[in-house]
A protein has these predicted regions:
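A domain-start/cap signature at the N-terminus of enzymes
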Residues: 18-57, 65-89, 117-134, 153-158, ...
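Cap/lid segment of the alpha/beta-hydrolase catalytic domain
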Residues: 96-130, 262
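Active-site glycine-rich loops that stabilize anionic/oxyanionic intermediates
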Residues: 62-66, 195
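The feature captures the conserved acid-bearing segment of alpha/beta-hydrolase catalytic domains
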Residues: 182-289
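Structural cue for short, hydrophobic secondary-structure segments
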Residues: 58-63, 92, 249
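Conserved acidic catalytic loop of the alpha/beta-hydrolase fold
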Residues: 134-152
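C-terminal catalytic histidine-bearing segment of alpha/beta-hydrolase fold enzymes
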Residues: 250, 264, 281-324
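Conserved alpha/beta-hydrolase
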Residues: 85-100
Length: 324
């Protein structure tokens, strides 16, 4: 049985790898024009015209499969189940790579990244250069336009799996948006089932030999070799900003498979725990040791493993995304 299971996992890993190399089948239909190029994204409503009924915007970030439209639908379903579909705008950015652009004949105006570099906030490879995190900043800036969104009160940035990695690191490095404060628009982050987290010190929950894993404290796992997007901020400043932000960790109670095909099994990630659920608990414990008054929340979703749709549409997911 173990041999058969191993073969099945091998097939799953191969399929995921092939999907990444061959490009996505579905490219989101909308475009957000930025100076560096056009960002592919999906929208639940046309945000180019005023949306006077929208009080909340949900920016939902896909994982490494870059299936933004799947996440867009999960966000729409979660909002509808929570009874807030009418006043919620769902935005699903799509961080395409070079294979996606080639497969879908997208031309030279659509932003693209090398492989999965977008997860760590690296700049696009074309047509211009912009960090994936800076692209999120531009979405937030657009939402601060009171002519288009006169009733907006809250922006929620949520991501699952690879998208959870993006949201965690973006919450850590993300630039301030004074316009939101001026306009009374709050900003929250929901980090769901990421494979790893960025630590602020060399401390890790699992004993390991640093000599055999020299990159354990490099970005995206630690504070060494930070991306250009961070600018001149140091680790201490980043940590103080991060712990002050409104962050919820949404973890699947059954996301406990140490051999999951999409789990980061690098030595850098293994220092954080054996599987996603324990890695999440370990990280929050680490933060609470350093900041006893930490206001972050950890919410488990019973009976759910590594499934973005079930996480966000669950009663717990709805409550986190759309608190009444």
């Amino acid at each position: 049985m173990n041999k058969r299971l191993g073969l099945l996992l091998g097939v799953l890993v191969s399929c995921c790898t092939l999907a990444a190399e061959h490009g996505v089948k579905v490219v989101s239909p909308d475009r957000f024009h930025l100076e560096a190029g056009d960002l592919s994204l999906g929208l639940s409503q046309d945000w180019r015209q005023p949306l006077p009924k929208v009080t909340r915007a949900l920016i939902i970030v896909h994982g490494r499969l870059r299936n933004a439209q799947t996440y867009l639908q999960s966000g729409i379903d979660a909002a509808n189940h929570a009874g807030v579909g009418g006043d919620t705008l769902v935005i699903a950015p799509q961080f395409l790579n070079q294979a996606d652009v080639k497969r879908n004949h997208l031309g030279d105006q659509v932003l693209q990244w090398k492989a999965n570099d977008w997860m760590a906030g690296e700049p696009s490879t074309g047509p211009g250069h912009i960090s994936s995190y800076a692209a999120l900043d531009q979405i937030i800036k657009h939402l601060g336009n009171r002519t288009l969104f006169p009733a907006l009160k809250e922006i929620v940035i949520a991501g699952h799996s690879g998208g959870g990695q993006v949201v965690q690191r973006f919450a850590l490095t993300g630039h301030d948006h004074p316009l939101l404060q001026t306009e009374g628009i709050s900003l929250r982050y929901v980090v769901a089932n990421p494979s790893s987290y960025a630590y602020f010190s060399p401390q890790r929950p699992v004993p390991f030999d640093a000599a055999s894993c020299p990159g354990f404290n490099d970005w995206k796992y630690g504070m060494q070799k930070l991306p250009d997007y961070v600018g001149h901020q140091g680790a201490q400043q980043l940590e103080q900003t991060y712990v002050s932000r409104d962050i919820t960790y949404l973890l699947g109670e059954q996301d406990t498979d140490p051999n999951h095909p999409a789990l980061d099994k690098s030595c850098e990630a293994e220092t954080q725990g054996a599987y996603r659920l324990i890695r999440g608990h370990n990280y929050v414990d680490y933060l609470r040791q350093r900041h006893p008054q930490l206001g972050h929340r950890l919410v488990e979703v019973p009976g759910v493993g590594h499934d973005g749709d079930k996480m966000f549409t669950s009663p717990q997911g709805q409550k986190v995304l759309f608190p009444q």
